[in-house]
């Protein structure tokens, strides 16, 4: 009997890094379930799309139940939201929304897929954090809280699961050249950021996808519990 293909879930996959990750895993021969908030997205054959808003508790609950039936081998928690604000002005509802999408949802999805990974003695979990989950700066309290927390969860998962053949890692992108980054930074901001990056350019979504592709592959047999920065040297040089 031919071995079935690995099956992956990639959240936040309608554009940018998430789309690039879904596309790359498909090229690697992996069946992909992609999520997003759009009702319809054009994907290549081999990608199934599940629309879900992670701020909607009932939709999240339905998606969790769906995943429990899908025999998921690979989970990439990429979906995230952000709001930049001075600490004293942060609205608690905004804070709760950011933690719900960036931390609570990955927690629930991990709980949904890990039982199958344990049964199969194989699994790969990649949580997309951020440079702001490794360092931080002013006006990032909500986002950094969620991303530092997500990395903490990754380390806890690795300590608990790595001996079962389940490897869990975080990937922390820096400034990536996406439509969202361009809209937030503007032309002036883009130029300023590029000057601060040792490589002198923004990263590309396909570079994030390439790293994730390797981390979830059978070539990765010994990396677990790490928060790997992919930022052109921004946080270290």
What residue spans do the PLM features occupy?
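Short, small/polar-rich loop/turn modules that mediate ligand/substrate recognition or access, typified
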Residues: 162, 167, 223-225
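C-terminal substrate-recognition "lid" of short-chain dehydrogenase/reductases
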Residues: 122, 202-230, 235
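Substrate-binding pocket helix/loop in short-chain dehydrogenase/reductase
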Residues: 86-87, 94-99, 193
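Residue(s) in the substrate-gating loop at a strand-loop-helix junction
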Residues: 130
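Active-site helix of classical SDR
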Residues: 110, 146
């Amino acid at each position: 009997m031919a071995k079935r293909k690995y099956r992956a879930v990639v959240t936040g996959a309608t554009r940018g890094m998430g789309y690039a990750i879904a596309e790359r895993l498909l090229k690697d021969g992996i069946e992909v379930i992609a999520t997003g908030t759009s009702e319809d997205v054009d994907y290549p054959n081999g990608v199934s799309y599940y629309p879900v808003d992670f701020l909607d508790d009932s939709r999240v609950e339905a998606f969790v139940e769906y995943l429990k039936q899908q025999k998921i081998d690979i989970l990439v928690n990429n979906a995230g939201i952000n709001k930049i604000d001075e600490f004293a002005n942060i609205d608690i509802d905004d804070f709760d929304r950011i933690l719900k999408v960036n931390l609570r949802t990955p927690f629930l999805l991990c709980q949904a897929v890990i039982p199958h990974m344990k049964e199969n003695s194989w699994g790969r979990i990649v949580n997309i954090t951020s440079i702001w989950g490794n360092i931080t700066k002013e006006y990032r309290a909500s986002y950094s809280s969620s991303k530092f927390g997500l990395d903490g969860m990754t380390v806890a998962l690795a300590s608990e699961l790595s001996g079962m053949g389940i490897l869990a890692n975080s990937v922390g992108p820096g400034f990536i050249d996406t439509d969202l980054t361009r809209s937030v930074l503007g032309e002036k901001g883009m130029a300023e950021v590029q000057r601060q990056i040792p490589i002198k350019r923004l990263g590309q979504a396909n570079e994030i996808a390439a790293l994730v592709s390797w981390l979830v592959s059978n070539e990765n047999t010994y990396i677990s519990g790490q928060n790997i920065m992919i930022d052109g040297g921004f946080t270290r040089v």
